[in-house]
């Protein structure tokens, strides 16, 4: 049975409001044809039991053949044109053979069960497509764009361009990934980040398409086109993953061709040899048709893809995008995980951690006001952290003049008539003079740097007046994720970072990582990955920066955090954690392992049924109806078993396994 791919046509709709709906069963042509075939078969069986004329039974059963068998028959003929022997065609031939020897009811039963298993397969594909449609339906169809003169116009969200200003009213869905320019509100972004409570948003904060604005109005600047938004990337990656095949499936399909040819040869032998020993042609043909049916690898072919596709769809709904069935399959074989530091275990965005004032004329807010004003024209990340801290305290920044940037050292500007310099301790000690810097200030700088903080000195009119400690905040879930990863894989994770040893060791202690490798360049990270894998580890590497891309490519599986601003990193990674929640990494590994267990169970069920029925048919006499029912029944069992991973409880169960 051919595994159907997710059709892009099934993932589009004219109305965004319809996109989140689940596909109804009878919206699928496979379901309609299977139901019609079942109805005709039931009617034919009823007429047979009631003693109706033979032509009535035959008419109903032949109609069952046509409705349930035309799609697999056509698919089989098309495969034959490509010189491929398809199981679909073999099943139709077997059903026709059954009719040829007067066993039309049994052949119709085969058609019905085969059509039903095909409908179940289509249902798996449709449910995956539903997840894609649901994601695409999160973003609104229109947006209120604000013109240069302040006028408002309603436009299609797809027509928004980078830099456009959009007004988001209370209760509206946000139409694009953007930055807040004015206003304040709380935003429900559970659909993208998974956070259960609304998140406060103010000037400078990032918002995502498809999230819901709260009680305040926001004016936002578009950062990404609609096709590049977070939800669009999720949908694209889930769709692409659904069109791939796992290594197990590729192996099965490779073997299937040779198996099918051998099966046809044995079928011919089963038909041709017994008459030489006196068996009737009709009995030999019946045995041969029964053999062809029960030896068909339908259940084997269906064993692999439904569980993996269901796992991909479920993980996608929870913010983890596996780019292919191969990736979903490989995740479960992970024996060790390596994490980058900045942007992975930490948020990747510098934040102000503390203020130390060394002149009584300044308060904390006044010192921050001067430093933020001086840094406002700067494009340095540390300067942005200082400005954001001032904005979060709602400090109004004064006008700045005579701004000068000295890259890597400091910035200077005239603020309120004072010359303010903000920069590194090393650079500004030379400017201000070590004699002017109090001993307590020197001690504080040394201590904070030893603790892993970046220290910024604020100088007013050539006199140092305060210190600002800036840090890259540890993700709150990092320690829990490391603990879960250790329990799940049986090996403690590794920290691979380009940061200095002191900072890396401090973070390792915080999250529970003993194997810390610091000061690594991109090539060094690749070498570390290869060394770990040479020791037998199947390594999953988690990173976010462009410097992590080579290591992600070299790993058994590479996972990028959704905050990664590098397109190269996102393209190189095998999977993406869109919601930036580290705890989903152990969960998706547990989900992959469960999918692999279901695949193995399916293969055991399929092979056991086929082997048992083949032996029964060749060694004894297997009634055709019983052979059809048991063979196709095993196919349906395998298909339904794979569908279990589509349920929301499957993700919760995987999370429970990973974090117990």
Curated annotation (Swiss-Prot):
It comes from Mycobacterium tuberculosis (strain ATCC 25618 / H37Rv). Pfam families: E1-E2_ATPase, Hydrolase. Mg(2+) binds at residues 544, 548. InterPro entries: ATPase_P-typ_cyto_dom_N, ATPase_P-typ_P_site, ATPase_P-typ_TM_dom_sf, ATPase_P-typ_transduc_dom_A_sf, Cation_Transport_ATPase, HAD-like_sf, HAD_sf, P-typ_ATPase_IB. Keywords: ATP-binding, Cell membrane, Magnesium, Membrane, Metal-binding, Nucleotide-binding, Phosphoprotein, Translocase, Transmembrane, Transmembrane helix. The active site is at 340 (4-aspartylphosphate intermediate). One of its GO terms (cellular component) is plasma membrane. One of its GO terms (molecular function) is metal ion binding. Belongs to the cation transport ATPase (P-type) (TC 3.A.3) family. Type IB subfamily. This is Probable cation-transporting P-type ATPase J. NCBIfam families: ATPase-IB_hvy, ATPase_P-type. The lineage of its organism: Bacteria, Bacillati, Actinomycetota, Actinomycetes, Mycobacteriales. The keyword Glycoprotein does not apply.
């Amino acid at each position: 049975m051919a595994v159907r791919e997710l059709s892009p046509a099934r993932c589009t709709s004219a109305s965004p409001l319809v996109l989140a709906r689940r596909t109804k069963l009878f919206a699928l042509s496979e379901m309609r044809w299977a139901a019609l075939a079942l109805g005709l078969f039931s009617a034919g069986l009823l007429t047979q039991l009631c003693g109706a004329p033979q032509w009535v039974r035959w008419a109903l059963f032949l109609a069952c053949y046509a409705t349930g068998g035309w799609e697999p028959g056509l698919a089989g003929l098309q495969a034959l044109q490509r010189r491929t022997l398809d199981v679909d065609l073999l099943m139709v031939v077997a059903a026709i053979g059954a009719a040829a020897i007067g066993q039309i009811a049994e052949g119709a039963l085969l058609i019905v069960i085969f059509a039903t298993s095909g409908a179940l397969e289509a249902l798996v594909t449709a449910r995956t497509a539903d997840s894609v449609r649901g994601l695409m339906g999160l973003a609104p169809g229109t947006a209120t764009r604000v013109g240069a003169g302040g006028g408002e116009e309603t436009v299609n969200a797809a027509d928004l361009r980078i830099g456009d200003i959009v007004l988001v009213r209370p209760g509206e869905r946000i139409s694009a990934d953007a930055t807040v320019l004015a206003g304040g509100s709380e935003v429900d972004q559970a659909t993208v980040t998974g956070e259960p409570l609304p998140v406060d948003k103010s000037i400078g904060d990032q918002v995502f398409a498809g999230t819901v604005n709260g009680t305040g109005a926001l004016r936002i600047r578009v950062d990404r086109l609609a096709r590049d938004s977070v939800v669009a990337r999720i949908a694209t990656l889930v769709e692409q993953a659904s069109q791939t095949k796992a290594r197990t499936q590729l192996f099965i399909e490779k073997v299937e061709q040779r198996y099918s040819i051998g099966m046809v040869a044995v079928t011919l032998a089963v038909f041709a040899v017994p008459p030489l020993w006196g068996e009737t042609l009709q009995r030999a043909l019946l045995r041969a048709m029964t053999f062809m049916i029960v030896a068909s690898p339908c259940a084997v072919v269906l064993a692999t893809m439904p569980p993996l596709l269901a796992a991909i769809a479920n993980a996608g709904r929870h913010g983890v995008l596996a780019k292919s069935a191969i990736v979903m399959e490989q995740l479960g074989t992970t024996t060790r995980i390596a994490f980058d530091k900045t942007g992975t275990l930490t948020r990747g965005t510098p934040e102000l951690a503390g203020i130390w004032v060394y002149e009584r004329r300044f308060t904390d807010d006044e010192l921050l006001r001067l430093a933020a004003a001086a840094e406002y024209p700067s494009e340095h990340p540390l300067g942005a952290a200082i400005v954001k801290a001032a904005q979060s305290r709602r400090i109004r920044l004064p006008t700045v003049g005579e701004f000068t940037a000295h890259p890597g050292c400091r910035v200077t500007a005239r603020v309120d008539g004072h010359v303010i310099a903000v920069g590194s301790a090393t650079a500004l000690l030379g400017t201000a003079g070590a004699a002017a810097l109090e001993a307590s200030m020197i001690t504080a700088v040394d201590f904070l740097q030893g603790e892993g903080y970046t220290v910024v000195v604020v100088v007013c009119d050539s006199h140092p007046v305060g210190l600002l400690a800036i840090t890259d905040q540890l993700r709150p879930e990092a320690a829990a994720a490391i603990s879960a990863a250790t329990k799940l894989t049986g090996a403690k994770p590794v920290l691979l970072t380009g940061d200095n040893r002191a900072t890396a060791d401090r973070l390792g202690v915080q999250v529970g990582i003993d194997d810390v490798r610091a000061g690594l360049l991109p090539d060094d990270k690749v070498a570390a990955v290869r060394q770990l894998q040479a020791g037998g580890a199947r390594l999953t590497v988690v990173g976010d920066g462009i410097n992590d891309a080579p290591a992600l490519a070299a790993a058994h599986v590479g996972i990028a955090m959704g905050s990664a601003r590098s397109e190269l990193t996102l393209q190189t990674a095998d999977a993406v954690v869109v919601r930036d929640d580290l705890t989903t990494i152990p969960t998706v590994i547990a989900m992959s392992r469960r999918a692999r267990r279901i695949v193995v169970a399916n293969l055991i069920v399929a092979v056991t049924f086929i082997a048992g029925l083949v032996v029964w048919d060749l060694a004894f006499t297997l009634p055709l109806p019983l052979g059809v029912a048991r063979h196709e029944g095993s196919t349906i069992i395998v298909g339904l078993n794979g569908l279990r991973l589509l349920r929301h409880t499957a993700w919760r169960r995987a999370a429970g396994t990973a974090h117990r």
